[in-house]
Regions:
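Conserved HxN/HPN-centered segment at the entrance to the catalytic loop
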Residues: 115-134
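Catalytic-loop of the protein kinase fold
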Residues: 186-206
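C-lobe/activation-segment region of protein kinase-like
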Residues: 213-292
Length: 328
């Protein structure tokens, strides 16, 4: 779309559905998004000739940080269509992560997320969107807004209503079916030489309209010395552990409640990344099938063999899936 000049009068008209009109109000208009801290509620961002009304900064809870504000991620209204969109602006950060003895350098890459948005166009298990350059050649991503809750929230809600055994037989089989579809989505990325880069249980949203499990947030990339897909695979393992346990099974909680299995646990039974979480769930819940527990133990501190490819994980998950009765 050709770039247009938007007068203050036109912007007043376009935003009237969402903003109360104030005499003499003037919008701040940005075509260069480099300084994303300056872009605030009620401002206008113009991307490729399309005006967006900025609403709020996105927030995200992670590792106990409730509603951590992400100043480079803006909730907005596409003033052409009236649809809510997420605008991700360019923000660079790096950090190191360790899995066992392997260290990974992680960094944000807008270019990588733009590639993935092109790659996964119309695939149902992925958040959709597109990328565009602003006037300063920043790669901005314009993303659909998915109405729904995270997979983590879904499990927490279930955990307030039933015991684990009831959950495992009544809810887990369907959750496993959807999880496998998500893993198939990651396999698709890997088959095309790409990685998700930040696989977490709160990076799967359950679409309120379709019930579809959908991956979000593809901007992290990983520098690797060994298996380029290893970081994604460990993320998938952590999610599976959470799903199978109806939440994290934490050693300190077991000890505090004087759980009968606590004295049977050894160092090899814990999660390879989070050493306070139990990977060997069969020691806690005897009815966990061996086929599932074998998968979980690939992500334990005592593991000697790891998954190299998502296809290996999917094959083992299919075996677990086949052990549950088919729903009518």
């Amino acid at each position: 779309m050709a770039s247009l000049d938007f007068s203050q009068e036109l912007l007043q008209e376009l935003t009237s559905k969402w903003l109360s009109q104030k005499p003499g109000q003037r919008f701040k208009v940005y075509k260069d998004t480099t300084d994303f801290f300056r872009i605030e509620y009620g401002d206008i961002v113009i991307l490729d000739g399309n005006p967006f009304l900025i609403r709020h900064n996105a927030k995200e809870g992670r590792f106990g940080l409730d509603d951590e504000e992400k100043f480079w991620v803006k909730r907005s209204i596409d003033l052409r269509s009236g649809m809510t969109k997420i605008i991700k602006l360019v923000f660079h950060e790096t950090f190191n992560a360790r899995i066992g003895e392997i260290e990974f350098e992680c960094f944000r890459s807008p270019r990588k997320e733009a590639r993935i948005l092109n790659l996964i166009k119309d695939l149902p298990n992925f958040m959709q969107g597109y990328s565009v350059q602003d006037d300063h050649e920043n790669i901005v991503r314009v993303l659909e807004f998915i109405y729904g809750i995270s997979l983590a929230e879904h499990i927490r809600e279930i955990a307030t209503t039933m015991k684990h055994e009831a959950y495992f037989y009544q809810c887990f089989p369907k959750i496993l079916d959807n999880y496998i579809l998500c893993v198939e989505g990651i396999r698709f990325l890997h088959d095309h030489g790409e990685k998700h880069g930040d696989i977490r249980r709160d990076h799967i949203l359950i679409d309120r309209e379709s019930g579809q499990y959908r991956w979000i947030d593809y901007d992290y990339n990983v520098r690797h010395r060994e298996n380029m897909y290893g970081y994604d695979l460990f993320g998938l393992g952590n999610i599976l552990m959470y799903l199978a346990g109806m939440g994290d099974i934490v050693y300190q909680d077991l000890k505090r409640s004087d759980h009968p299995s606590v004295d049977k646990l050894i160092e090899d039974d814990v999660n390879i990344v989070f050493h306070n979480r139990i990977a060997n769930l069969k020691k806690i819940y005897f009815y966990i099938p061996d086929s599932l527990n074998r998968i979980l133990m690939h992500f334990s501190k005592g593991a000697h063999v790891f998954y190299d490819y998502t296809t290996q994980l999917i094959d083992d998950l299919r075996e677990v899936q086949s052990s549950f009765p088919k729903s009518a």
